[in-house]
Amino acid sequence: MIVLLLFALLWMVEGVFSQLHYTVQEEQEHGTFVGNIAEDLGLDITKLSARGFQTVPNSRTPYLDLNLETGVLYVNEKIDREQICKQSPSCVLHLEVFLENPLELFQVEIEVLDINDNPPSFPEPDLTVEISESATPGTRFPLESAFDPDVGTNSLRDYEITPNSYFSLDVQTQGDGNRFAELVLEKPLDREQQAVHRYVLTAVDGGGGGGVGEGGGGGGGAGLPPQQQRTGTALLTIRVLDSNDNVPAFDQPVYTVSLPENSPPGTLVIQLNATDPDEGQNGEVVYSFSSHISPRARELFGLSPRTGRLEVSGELDYEESPVYQVYVQAKDLGPNAVPAHCKVLVRVLDANDNAPEISFSTVKEAVSEGAAPGTVVALFSVTDRDSEENGQVQCELLGDVPFRLKSSFKNYYTIVTEAPLDREAGDSYTLTVVARDRGEPALSTSKSIQVQVSDVNDNAPRFSQPVYDVYVTENNVPGAYIYAVSATDRDEGANAQLAYSILECQIQGMSVFTYVSINSENGYLYALRSFDYEQLKDFSFQVEARDAGSPQALAGNATVNILIVDQNDNAPAIVAPLPGRNGTPAREVLPRSAEPGYLLTRVAAVDADDGENARLTYSIVRGNEMNLFRMDWRTGELRTARRVPAKRDPQRPYELVIEVRDHGQPPLSSTATLVVQLVDGAVEPQGGGGSGGGGSGEHQRPSRSGGGETSLDLTLILIIALGSVSFIFLLAMIVLAVRCQKEKKLNIYTCLASDCCLCCCCCGGGGSTCCGRQARARKKKLSKSDIMLVQSSNVPSNPAQVPIEESGGFGSHHHNQNYCYQVCLTPESAKTDLMFLKPCSPSRSTDTEHNPCGAIVTGYTDQQPDIISNGSILSNETKHQRAELSYLVDRPRRVNSSAFQEADIVSSKDSGHGDSEQGDSDHDATNRAQSAGMDLFSNCTEECKALGHSDRCWMPSFVPSDGRQAADYRSNLHVPGMDSVPDTEVFETPEAQPGAERSFSTFGKEKALHSTLERKELDGLLTNTRAPYKPPYLTRKRIC
């Protein structure tokens, strides 16, 4: 019979849990319907499988089974209530079911109803009771209790005895609900009349009240026949004994004792004491357990027969039973002893001896990093078998993890996400749950689970650098590997599988895919064509790395700059002079009367390459065996190195092979043949007048009508004029040098000896005004490091001028530019600075009383440490920088200046290959001497007449270049007698000669030792001085 009782108790604790209650009778057959869980919960049966309807594993029972598709709960095997729940008044089976999506948990209680399937039974089929004949009516004698495994109304209800006149039964109920019978003597016994009485003792249960048990209702068990009442019998034999007048007596009928559980065996429970006033054996009392004590109590307790000591003999467990009833009897040893009875009620005190237990019902193996906070990860329950505070459990989640515990229902908890997860920060978490009770001392249990974080495509690929500069040499092989870009993705799996590509763009009107390609797997870049630096120097494009993530792939970009590196793949092309129309060599005519330095032509070439690959060098490779011609290796100017031999046959032209070579690796070159035809006649003007020895630098083309005598006379006249001018120029130079040396002794050494300030300026007078100051320092030699040229800001309009001739490529130009110098001499230190002054006005002045440049020279001592420049005191920082400048100036210089090792000064010995010696020059200095003669002593004043010439008289004036910027800064300085000046130098005598005089000269070879201040040193020094104004020529010229 099946009884279905649906209490429909739906508990929705935070919307997760519900509870159902069913009843079923024991001993039902397999397949008996218990209830439809899905229907009772109002669930859609068609969606049970999709929502993952299932039972919690640790709540399953073999007695019941659940159809997961229909939600029907039925009996799987027969249920024996007495076997499952023993004597418990309530027998409930628990089943937990849940739905995964969304998570819903339901607790189902199935109460097993008892049926009257067990009759009462006595421990023994024959019971014997001995009663003294002296027993008085009303005396009670407890009988052995019957046992009925059924509970409730089906349990033992009553006892019956065969009707008689001597005895009756009084049924008593124990504290635990069990019933036992006491035999009551109704009238005195007479052993002599009847020594033995036999009756049938019957135990009757409560069956037969109806078809269902307590709380029965409609359902599967309706309509079953009522259950029959069951009985059990035993033969009761009463033996009448001889009388024993006194019965032992206990102090009290009931004793109550409390013991903590887990008390060790041998622990005293109580010391019982019963007294008997009789003497001898009739008064000697012995103790024993009563016949109706439970078997479990016999196992747990022990009683001493002689002393009445009741002690623990087993393990007490509060969780098994909180109370035990121990029945003890005492009787004397006399004949016909009548026992006395008492009850010991043992209450077991709970001890915190059970740690909490954690049981996980469901655990998700992986949770997505994109899961929202509050997502359920695991479900578990916690139980503690102890009671009260010892059974109250608290749970916590260890560690700093983005999860938290959420209490759901009774002792059920869920682990949910507390914050958004990031797999890149942690791809797995070990969650440790600790359950701790409130006992003293508290017990705890921990259990760990592993939760994996599944990846979400939330990271875009990133390149190792945002911009790649890739250098590719031109003329590369198409399809060659040029570079590899790389990107990384913090995701994993398909979300981190990258594919490289190039974004579409146009390069010179064509798609980038015609220039480069990329390997989509490894990011290798390949050139699809051979690059030409002359057509395309650089281009840029973007590469993209895209992952294979879903639902949406992410991408990252980087810029790639392809920089084409030039190769020397273009030979120089000669563009002038051009060959004839029929491919005949270019032709030039050379007057027989041409002077050395005559500009025959300028060879011009171009190179499509760049940098060193396009820097060209010109040379004569063949046809110049007599060294008649020389070629400027930089400009390509072809000039005569000496006069044409008079005996040269005009019909035999010179065939020169000109080579133009670049500086690439390997170098490439081109050649051209130039036919030079000798002609007689007058010389026509030719641009590019000689910077060599020619007087005015202008030569005449020959006149076809002129005769040989006119040419010969003109040559003789020029030779005589050149010799005369050279002699006069040399004589003037010697006189000037002697005068300068004398004035230097007078003006410099004397001033130093008197510790005065020496004022020298190439632009005007005033140099003697400061020499009148009194001397307070010791004499000191003047060294080159004691000279500093400084720029003057207050420049008047009448400086001295020195005209300088500068040679251009196609003519001669004269420029007048004047510079003022300030020579600062320091008597206290040999480290003095050399600085420029501003250029003076180009107008010429003869006023000897006025100082046009405003230049001053002051010596400084310990009391006056600063240098006065432009009317202001120089700072200490400037002094420090001046010391650094002096250090560089005083460094050991290279003997034989490297500047003269370049092919800047040419002579007739040069064949065009740079084989002339240093300082060689065949130039005529006639016109140069004439200019020098006009302005050479324009700086002298009235003081020079009285005291001798000072330094400013012989110091040369620097002349800047014309409006065009020169190709080389060394060509912007002019030294008389030299075609082009590679470097301006300072010459000084060795310091080993104590009597040697120091001078400031620019005339090339007059000193044995000379050194060059390199351009980089000068630029650095001038920058460190922090002058208020930096003229442009300081960055282009060298100084001595």
Swiss-Prot record:
The chain crosses the membrane at residues 716-736. This is Protocadherin-10. Moderately expressed in all regions of the brain examined, as well as in testis and ovary, and low expression in all other tissues tested. InterPro entries: Cadherin-like_dom, Cadherin-like_sf, Cadherin_C, Cadherin_CS, Cadherin_N, Protocadherin/Cadherin-CA. It is a single-pass type I membrane protein. Residues 207-223, 686-697 have a biased composition (Gly residues). Residues 19-122, 123-250, 251-358, 359-463, 464-574, 582-690 form the Cadherin domain. The gene is PCDH10. Potential calcium-dependent cell-adhesion protein. (Microbial infection) Acts as a receptor for Western equine encephalitis virus. SMART domains: CA. PANTHER family: CADHERIN-87A, PROTOCADHERIN-10. Its main location: membrane. Residues 910-926 have a biased composition (Basic and acidic residues). It is found in: Cell membrane. One of its GO terms (cellular component) is postsynaptic membrane. The keyword Signal applies. Gene3D superfamilies: Cadherins. Residues 19-715 are extracellular. Keywords: Calcium, Cell adhesion, Cell membrane, Glycoprotein, Membrane, Receptor, Repeat, Signal, Transmembrane, Transmembrane helix. One of its GO terms (molecular function) is calcium ion binding. It comes from Homo sapiens (Human).
